[in-house]
Amino acid sequence: MECCRRAAPGTPLLVLAFLLLSSRTARSEEDREGLWDAWGPWSECSRTCGGGASYSLRRCLSSKSCEGRNIRYRTCSNVDCPPEAGDFRAQQCSAHNDVKYHGQLYEWLPVSNDPDNPCSLKCQAKGTSLVVELAPKVLDGTRCYTESLDMCISGLCQIVGCDHQLGSTVKEDNCGVCNGDGSTCRLVRGQYKSQLSASKSDDTVVAIPYGSRHIRLVLKGPDHLYLETKTLQGTKGENSLSSTGIFLVDNSTVDFQKLPDKEILRMTGPLTADFIIKIHDLGPADSTVQFIFYQPIIHRWRETDFFPCSATCGGGYQLTSAECYDLRSNRVVADQYCHYYPENVKPKPKLQECNLDPCPASDGYKQIMPYDLYHPLPRWEATPWTACSSSCGGGIQSRAVSCVEEDIQGHVTSVEEWKCMYTPKMPVVQPCNIFDCPKWLAQEWSPCTVTCGQGLRYRVVLCIDHRGMHTGGCSAKTKPHIKEECIIPTPCYKPREKLPIEAKLPWFKQAQELEEGAAVSEEPSFIPEAWSACTVTCGVGTQVRIIRCQVLLPFSQSVADLPADECEGPKPASQRACYAGPCNGETPEFNPDNGDGLLGGLQDLDELYDWEYEGFTKCSESCGGGVQEAVVSCLNKQTRELADENLCVTSRRPPQLLKSCNLDPCPASHLLSREMNEVVVLADELCHHPKPSTVQACNRFNCPPAWYPAQWQLCSRTCGGGIQKRDVLCKQRMADGSFLELPETFCSASKPTSHQGCKKDDCPSEWLLSEWSECSVSCGEGTQTRSAICQRVLKTGVSTVVNSTLCPPLPFSSSIRPCMLATCARPGRPSTKHSPHIAAARNIYIQTRRQRKLHFVVGGFAYLLPKTTVVLRCPTRRFRKPLITWEKDGQHSISSAHVTVAPFGYLKIHRLKPSDAGIYTCSAGPAREQFVIKLIGGNRKLVARPLSLWSEEEEALQVRKTNPKEALQTHKHQNGIFSNGSKAEKRGLTADPGNRYDDIVSRLLEQGGWPGELLASWEVQDSAERNASSEEDPNAEQALLHLPFTMVAEQKRLDDILRNLSQQPEELRDLYSKHLVAQLAQDIFRSHLENQDLLPKPSEQRFPPMAVPAHKHVSGFSSSLRSSSGEAGGGSRRPHRKPAILRKISAAQQLSASEVVTHLGQTVALASGTLSVLLHCEAVGNPRPTIHWTRNGEAVQFSDRILLQPDDSLQILAPVEADVGFYTCNATNALGYDSVSIAVTLAGKPLVKTSRMTVLNTEKPTVTVDIGGTVRTVRGVNVTINCQVAGVPEAEVTWFRNKSKLGSSHHLHEGSSHHLHEGSLLLTDVSFSDQGLYSCRAANLHGEQTESTQLLILDPPQVPTQLEDIRALLLATGPNLPSVLMSPLGTQLVLDPGNSALLGCPIKGHPTPNITWFQNGQPIATAPGLTHHIWGAGQILRVANLSGGPQGEFSCLAQNEAGTLLQKASLVIQDYWWSVDRLATCSASCGNRGIHQPRLRCLLNTTEVDPEHCTGKPRPAVQPVACNRRDCPSRWMVTSWSACTRSCGGGVQTRRVTCQKLKASGISTPVSNDMCSQLAKRPVDTQACNQQLCVEWAFSSWGQCNGPCIGPRLAVQHRQVFCQTRDGITLPSEQCSALPRPVSTQNCWSEACSVHWRVSLWTLCTATCGNYGFQSRRVECVHVRTNKAVPEHLCSWGPRPANWQRCNVTPCENTECRDTTRYCEKVRQLKLCQLGQFRSRCCGTCGKA
């Protein structure tokens, strides 16, 4: 009990020291972290349920700022709120109900799912479209979106995972489990195809169980889906799904879509009931339903707790189990339910040791608990592996693995396997001999045996194993052939042989004596023995040998002899001729022509002798590579003895074969003289014979697997100790040279290392810099510093700090740098006036002459020639020039050899090149200005710059640089003004702000006739040409001298030109632009001359006429256009063109001017001194357009005060207030018209252009009107209300809706919004909530004017999605009458005669549609004989007393201003009756039995139906009619077959065949067989039968009685039962399946089964009361006679008695303090009484202690 000892006297001092040390350590860590104080306690949760937020604060203990945040958040109260709690956002909105908004109280409803700012409190006034942001932030814990767990904290939306943790991205899986792996459910998908019949109109598609998720069904076809549900409480329900919509079915949301060709059903889930999806037959065609959903696995394995320990002391163990648990009913069920799901894997039992305390000495032995098992733990034991099933090519071997247990005495017994499941079971099967089997490897072919004609060639074929060694075991059947014929194209003139010359086996096999003998295999084959001796001693004799059919028995590895017919293939010869040498001194040469006579029929004497190789000669060299020659000898093939070479045919002698030898290099030696046989190396050209090959193939078989390491990779570090890696793979080099990558287990050698150290030397010392400190000041200019330490990385990889002298000198700029914050405010002056400012120049520069250097100020655009040096200056105020920074295309610029960033604030680019083009940005603190540089090519074209160089940031800066209005106009008009719809324009390339002026500058460069043209011709001339041109035109050189180096234009001037061009018609824009560009070029040049005082006086002319063209003002452009046809010359005809009015920009009007002259598109303000107003209107077109004027939409009434001038201008003399309005010039010709307006106001008062007409739109997607009228349109269109205003100064336009002011852009309702642009109001996707009065108010200093337009939304007639209202109306009109709803496609209602019916016309629309009824296309009122009534505002039609037959088609036509809708339905009166059809076919073709039977049909409206419908209807009387009553032709008549003569093995059966004739009277008489033979072939009268084999069951004798015990002294014995023929041939068992099979198993008496369970007496109970007492006994299986223990499995036929039980399970009396266990004395001795569990059980003993 060490934990309870009192501390030693010195302990408090040690604790105090430890606390002080800990405090220092914590304080040092805090110093590094910025001196933060500890986090404070968590605040109260912002919500009590539904997920809220809590925060904790900390404070900074330093006087400086601390890094990090001083607040942190966490989620809390993550429990669902009760249903009555309501929405948290709605509660915050309702808190403002008692606060007046604009003087009025509203009931506020929440506006959720705002995509722009989800954490602001936006609420909508109930009953209105007013949406207001009542608070910038919602309370912490409010959900950002209704369908998300993300919550708002401090006004920002924070991500919350399904685990309710902030910042967590954990999501639910498809089963609804947070961060699950999808294993608790299974994906179910399938397809159903309807196969409905007339009697069955409904069918079940699929049953979707409770808890399923993500359900989707799609029905394609005419049928209809509907639902049946059943809750866990047994409540059933049904939903017909009659219309599209979202329904709540048993607390589950159902999304149903009913489309014309299909139906779609979606349910997110989880389902709260079992759903049965059914289909209802509505059409003749089949329907298909595809479904998919995730079904929960409701039965899962659940691991139990540990069982009680197997022993009370001394060490035991305890196990767990697994039980199948039903998640729906929350109860344990049978295991079979968990086996239904393959995903369910039953957990293995767990085992752990327990009660490891030694047993008390008084016990004697430990008590056994639930299991009769002993220490140590059970373990797996395995038998040795069996032999491999295959010697190569991959086999298997197995072993037995069992669970055993060892008791205290060391006895090992087998136990159940589950007791060893706490460790993995050893494998019982493993692969073996997975190497390849030996296979044949063929060598190269030898040369042909002949030099002419036909011969043979040979090759060596070896059997090679997987290691590349020569071995046996290859199949002889797959051996490649070793010889083949070869043909030499050289003809032979004296052939000796008729047959091909046959050579012997190649040298590589014979010379090395590798010939293989015949081997016995596992397949039966002929095996010859050795030949006998020759029968004669000289001359020709014979030899014999024995041929046996043998097979190798693999299991015994012995050879067995078989009958000869068991071996396939030809049998080898058993006799052959032999020759023993010449007799009586005969000549040893034989004549082949006499062979037949000498050998007495033997084929060829030459076969006795043949050439063979007999090894090799000695190597020609001892080192350095020599040659061996194969020795060829003539041998007797029978005796294998050498013979005279004359006995072998010379032409068959094999070729000379060589092989290399002694390839090792020779050791160094002294040079030898020529007299000592020195080898002299000569040039290859001096050798006449072909040079031998220096390369030959060798060892062409697979190499054994080996390790192949790759090259080492680069070292991970350049110094300081790094790591090198390489790949080491196990590969096998194949015979063809390729490599096969193998698993590492195939390589037996040790694997080379794949890692090694490298660069094990110290690194040079280097500076380690810290982060920059904060700026030294809070405003203005300060400094930042950072510290630096000198460190070195040692070869061990450890960094160490060294002396700073060992590091290179550190630049001053590396440790200190300036910083610039906001300018400090001066007393009494706002600080904003003292921020840095850059004095930019908004100019366009175009270089026209070569110049070495040009200076520019930022803020403009420069188009320059290459090789020009450029200096960019950035003039600033209130900012130090050394702090100015430069960027190019968004990248920071630094000084280089080509670009210089000077410390004085300017940038210098040396000799421009194409890569220098771009946007240069000068930054002075927060102030930024840009300068764009572009290059001009040699052909006066701009050098293109890649588009990718522009960044979005540069575009944003360029657009932001200009004022908003100018930027809007520029982007609106700059695209496509010059390009006329080029590809670049269509791609939006010209929207690049850096390319804004490229088009107009390109036109300026291309402009002919302006002074810059002199440059192009002057600079390309050499000096001689230039002098000559000067002599011819002295003014040209003088003009060039005064040309500027750069032309300068203001950006505003070019912006005005672009804006003016954008207002011109497209057909005139190109022509108009040429004049503007020419005028611009002239103005630029004149401006330069004026600045230089060089502008010529009217009397003098310095420049030639071509150099400075006559100046033409733009205002004269229209007149030149009008006369262009006459000026063209040649009488060429102009193309036809529709009218176009020229838009022009006039100078600003002077209010004091008495006469006002202006162009269209302007505003005229009438003052008191205005005497005349002249409105110009210039139009072009072919034919020439006619001009007429209107005022406020009405034609102008001309008078002596209002005049039309000859040039179609309108002049107003002495204008008065009645003349105020919008004057419109209309130009018209045969091709079209054009119109432009001009406003005339009184003293600058606002004027609004109005239109009092009513616009009705039902088809167009957009509507555009002037304010002042009424707009009636359908939903979903875009409505634009123009409010064109005029006034001086310009009037401000304000829009109102129902007298409420509208902002610039706002959402009116979900899916609709409005936008204000240049005084116009655009309403997108209008709906009913957009109806109202829209007012435009124009106001300026002189007054205001308001005009309004009423917007009415029309809804065309359509079928409502919810049909409950009209169904209730039908039910109220006629509760018991059949009814049908009309539909656009048509419906049908089948009625009985005399019934009445209700027809409903479901319709909705705005205004309410008018309904008209028709029958068969005629008005219902004119239908003859039809009683009808119309109710329910025309929606219900009742027709009464319908008679038989079809009633035709009824239709209802609904119409209003927005459109019409026709719906149809058909009424069919069903009446079934019997109809007599035509007579059926005669029942016989002859004789006396033929009759016609009339056929009855059940009809419904002339359609045949099931006869059951006519049950009860009167049947018409019908009588059969006789037919075909005549004599039949003769025919064969046969009797039945007789019984078979044998039951098996083949028998015969017969029948009688006669020829007979049937008379018309019905009598059949026999006739001659010839009469039947003429008509048909005589049937057979005999046939074979019972051809099957005669089989029977056969069986062997009973085996020994050694089967498993099934009772006392009772075991099982077996015998074999098989099917065979009566001849003893075994057949498959199926052949005897028709016969009763004899039994193959029977019970028998066995002495080994004379066993029974023997139990000992129960031990004493471990407790006298309570729930902890138990007792045990020993249970064992013993033999009845010997009474000795035997294995327990012999007693398994009887139940095993329990070996432990609870005892003394009675409650202990609390009042009596006594011992309840017999171990209390040990408890007292071990001093365990102070522990509660021992003190309670040993109350008496512990009380005494």
UniProtKB/Swiss-Prot annotation:
Gene source species: Mus musculus (Mouse)
Where in the sequence does glycosylation occur per the annotation? 251, 310, 391, 451
Limits of the PLAC domain: 1709-1745
The entry's comment on post-translational modification says:
Glycosylated. O-fucosylated by POFUT2 on a serine or a threonine residue found within the consensus sequence C1-X(2)-(S/T)-C2-G of the TSP type-1 repeat domains where C1 and C2 are the first and second cysteine residue of the repeat, respectively. Fucosylated repeats can then be further glycosylated by the addition of a beta-1,3-glucose residue by the glucosyltransferase, B3GALTL. Fucosylation mediates the efficient secretion of ADAMTS family members.
Query: Region (Disordered): which ranges?
Result: 966-991, 1114-1137
UniProt KW keywords? Disulfide bond, Extracellular matrix, Glycoprotein, Immunoglobulin domain, Repeat, Secreted, Signal
Name this polypeptide is given: ADAMTS-like protein 1
Note the SMART domains from the entry: IG, IGc2, TSP1
Summarize the subunit comment. Monomer.
Signal peptide coordinates: 1-28
Gene Ontology CC: one annotated term: extracellular region
What are the subcellular locations of this protein?
Secreted, Extracellular space, Extracellular matrix
- Ig-like C2-type domain location, by residue? 836-938, 1139-1241, 1261-1352, 1378-1468
Query: In which broad location class does this protein mainly occur, judging by the first location in its UniProt entry?
Result: secreted
Q: Which Gene3D superfamilies match?
A: 2.60.120.830, Immunoglobulins, Thrombospondin type-1 (TSP1) repeat
Q: Which InterPro entries match?
A: ADAMTS/ADAMTS-like (IPR013273), ADAMTS_ADAMTS-like (IPR050439), ADAMTS_CR_3 (IPR045371), ADAMTS_spacer1 (IPR010294), ADAMTSL1_dom (IPR056272), Ig-like_dom (IPR007110), Ig-like_dom_sf (IPR036179), Ig-like_fold (IPR013783)
Q: List the disulfide bonds.
A: 45-76, 49-81, 60-66, 534-578, 538-583, 549-567, 775-819, 779-824, 790-807, 874-922, 1177-1225, 1283-1336, 1401-1452
GO biological process assignments? extracellular matrix organization
The TSP type-1 domain is annotated at: 33-82, 376-424, 436-493, 522-584, 607-667, 703-762, 763-825, 1528-1591, 1649-1709
Bias (Low complexity) occurs at 1115-1126
TM segments?
none
Which PANTHER family does the UniProt entry name for this protein?
A: ADAMTS A DISINTEGRIN AND METALLOPROTEASE WITH THROMBOSPONDIN MOTIFS PROTEASE, PAPILIN
